[in-house]
Amino acid sequence: MKTIRQTLILLTFALFFAANVTAAPLDERQRTVETVVADALAQLPAATAGDYDKIMGELAATGAEGVGILADMLVPASQGENAAVEYALNGVASFVTAAGREQLRPAVCEGLLAALARCKDDANRAFLVSQLQLCATADNAAALAAYIDDPYLGDPVLRALISIPDSEATLLSLARRSDLSDAQRAAVRFSPKA
């Protein structure tokens, strides 16, 4: 009987410890990524520019996971409203492009690319591409170029690639393809980078 009791006590402590480890608090206030995202959405639009920067900084610090959670909240237009989520995603994509925030940018782009791969709604996919147009770097260009043949995303992807700094190599590889549409070929040819 004593052995069973000791075993139960040990199991209780082990479960308690495991629960605390897996909760993985994100910040000094012990908030999880899900909580940070929910808090940010509840506070937007922000009252001041300072509040806005604080909220966007917290969202950007959640990295790919937080961006993915936000992007997964996008719904087809016929099923609901996306304004708050789009506002938050646009804010984060813009926030990480400012000087001094470069370390946050790769994770945000990773989250946007992963969300793009999961998203099934064309309008929401185009929105995610537009956010990548804001914050993607040459490191993301090849992953984005994979969508050039998508009938709905081909043009937005091409516009994004043209906008991404140092994406010339990706654009040149596209220019060499024989299966581009005439409009795509013209856009690549007349791009200042190609």
Where are these regions (language model features)?
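Buried hydrophobic core positions in alpha-solenoid tandem helical repeats
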Residues: 36-41, 69-74, 111-116, 143-145, ...
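Helix-turn-helix repeat elements of alpha-solenoid scaffolds
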Residues: 67, 102-106
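HEAT/HEAT-like alpha-solenoid repeats
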Residues: 108-109, 180-181
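Bacterial N-terminal signal peptides
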Residues: 8-20
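Short N-terminal segments immediately surrounding and downstream of signal-peptide cleavage
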Residues: 24-45
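Short, charge-rich amphipathic alpha-helical segments embedded
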Residues: 63-82
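Bacterial N-terminal signal peptides that target proteins for export
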Residues: 1-9
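Structural detector for internal amphipathic alpha-helices that build alpha-solenoid repeat scaffolds
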Residues: 24-30, 50-62, 82-103, 114-118, ...
